[in-house]
Design a protein with these regions (language model features):
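Glycine-rich beta-strand-to-loop/alpha-helix junction loops that act as flexible
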Residues: 52-55, 175-185, 217
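Glycine-rich phosphate-binding loop plus the immediately following alpha-helix
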Residues: 6, 12-40, 48-119
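A glycine-rich, Thr/Ser-enriched phosphate-binding loop motif common to dinucleotide/cofactor-binding enzymes
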Residues: 22-32, 146-157, 216
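Glycine-rich phosphate-binding/hydrolytic loop that grips phosphoryl groups
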Residues: 152, 203-249
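A contiguous, well-structured pocket-lining segment that forms one wall/lid of small-molecule binding clefts
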Residues: 90-174, 185-197
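Short, structured coil segments at secondary-structure junctions
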Residues: 6-7, 196-198
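Short beta-strand-loop/turn "lid" adjacent to the catalytic site in phosphate-handling enzymes
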Residues: 1
């Protein structure tokens, strides 16, 4: 391809096609890299990697084996927050969650939105798209109040999904490690953290001296290496693929 010709290097691409051909959804592909990070940093299991990009997704790591990984989308991550900011300001996002901290959440609207989301999520399997969500439910609120309500909505969806999906006893501990751009939204992180029971703790990936801004690029570099070695990159419990599959060209 063009990039390979320009660089005079082998370039691996098209990671998702084989997964889709084998009945998978083509995403997420980062879970095996999440497992690598857990292994390298000797983090106790079970552990949950929460990736907050446009869509929020979870990787549950219960053992060292990639076959045991469980991963799925939980709902909106930054998508609603960023869209609200773009509609009302010249900015692309609410830096550190400053504007949402000024606002006041509408509990009535929040509860209605959560009920509506439950109806949507019951119809989905593993994957969401940004087009699954819209801002209509906060349309009448001020900029700050709308943003605060959206932060709490996003946090509740993430929190509820973790509790529903990861069954742990009261005396068991679970660590949630957050990566993705949403980890920088202090308002969102605070809203998630305050809802978690005492046996579930939340840290960001940077706490482990790993630069969270490069997780995705590092993940695909790792996938490229596995692809070149003809090693599996997706599993039934991560993409809903029919069988463990290699990927990339």
């Amino acid at each position: 391809n063009l990039l390979s010709s320009l660089l005079k290097k082998e370039v691996v691409y098209n990671f998702r096609e084989n997964d889709i051909l084998n009945g998978g959804q083509g995403a997420p592909l980062a879970p095996i890299f999440h497992n690598l990070l857990i292994n390298q940093n000797q983090i106790e299991r079970p552990a949950c990697v929460l990736n907050v990009g446009g869509i929020a997704n979870i990787t549950l790591v219960v053992s060292k084996n990639n076959e045991d990984l469980i991963s799925f989308d939980v709902g909106p991550g930054n998508c609603l927050l960023d869209e609200w900011v773009r509609r009302h300001t010249q900015m692309k996002y609410d830096e550190n969650g400053k504007a949402s901290n000024i606002g006041k959440t509408s509990e009535v609207i929040l509860n209605q939105a959560i009920d509506n989301f439950d109806n949507i999520s019951n119809q989905k399997k593993l994957s969401f798209d940004i087009k699954d969500f819209d801002l209509s439910f906060v349309k009448g609120l001020s900029y700050e109040d709308g943003l605060s309500t959206l932060v709490d909505f996003t946090a509740v969806i993430i929190y509820q999904s973790i509790l529903k999906s990861i069954k742990i006893r009261e005396n068991e501990k679970l660590l949630i490690i957050v990566c993705g751009g949403g980890r920088k939204n202090l308002s969102l992180m605070g809203s998630i953290r305050k809802r978690l029971p005492k046996n579930i703790s939340l840290k960001i990936i940077d706490d482990y001296k790993i630069d969270g801004d490069f997780i995705e690029s590092q993940a695909f570099a790792y996938l490229a290496i596995r692809s070149a070695l003809k090693k599996v990159i997706s599993y039934p419990n991560t993409t809903n693929v029919e069988k463990a599959s290699i990927g990339g060209i």
